[in-house]
Amino acid sequence: LSLEQISQKTELSRYAAQVLLEASLTIGTVLVKDDQYILAKAGWFLLNDEMAQVNMNFNQDVNYKGLFHLEEALLNGRPEGLKELGNWPTIYEGLSDLPGQAQKSWFGFDHFYSDNSFDQALEIVFSHSPRTLLDVGGNTGRWATKCVQYNEKVEVTIMDLPQQLEMMKQKTEKMVGHERIHGHGVNLLDEKVPFPKGFDAIWMSQFLDCFSEKEVISILSRAAQSMSAEGRLYIMETFWDRQKFETAAYCLTQISIYFTAMANGNSKMYHSDDMTRCIQESGLEIEEIYDNLGLGHSIVKCKLK
C-alpha cells in the first residue's frame, strides 16, 4: 500500500502515518519498494505470533508505567511500580482487582508459558499415580483442571490466597471434574502457616520465582514438614541457566525486572544452583530434574532427605 492508502485506511493524518511507517521501516517491520509499503517477516510475526503478542501485551499493560519506578524499587526492596496499577503490598493480592486489560494481559502471559508444559508435566507427575495432590499457588485452577481431567480419581486441593480461590471457583465451576477440585485459603508469606498433610504429591508451578530466597526456604521447609517418605514435591520453573537457547536466558533474566518493580520487590527468575541450595536447606533432596518441557520449563522432583 502507498502512504496515502495507509493514511486513509487507518484514518491517520498523512504525517502520523509517515512517522510510524518510517519508524517501522528502520526497525525492519515493513519494507518499501516503489513507494509501496510491504509487511516484512518481522512485522508479520509481531502481528501473528502468539508469544510476541503475549509478551508485548504484558509489557504494555502491566509493566510499562511501573518500570519508571525501577530504581526506587531496587533501592527500597519493594515493588514501587505497582502503585501504577493499584494499592497492594504485592501484585498477587491485587490480581483479582487489577484493571481489566492489565489483568487480561497478566494472566495471558502467565498461562501461555505454563500451558505449553502441562501435557508433559502430567505424564511426569502421574507416573507415580498420586491420588491426592496439593497445588500450591494454583491461581485460577488451570493445572488442577488438567489433573482431574487426566486422572478420574485424583483429588486436587489448591492452596492460595482466599481471593485467588474465589477466582478459581468461578473459572472451574463448569469444568469436567470440578467437584474434585478443592480450596485451602492461606497467605504463604506468613511463616506460621503450616502446609496441610496427607498429600501424595505437592505441585508448585511458576510459583517459587514469586518469592525471595528466604521466603522460598520457608515455604519449602513447611512443605517438607507436611510430607511423608513416599510423598514427592514437584517444582516447575523456567531456570535461566537451563535454557536451550541464549535468547531464552536473556528474556528470563529481563523478566526479573518485572518482579523487582511490579510484583514484590525481592524475587527473580532463578538460576538452578540457587534453587538447589534452597531445596537442600529445606530438608529436601533432588531426586530427578526434567528439562526442556514446553517453551523452556524444568521440573525438579524432590523427596525428603
Feature map (PLM): residue ranges:
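Alpha-helical subdomain
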Residues: 1-26, 31-32, 127, 134-305
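Conserved Class I S-adenosyl-L-methionine-dependent methyltransferase catalytic core
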Residues: 17-131
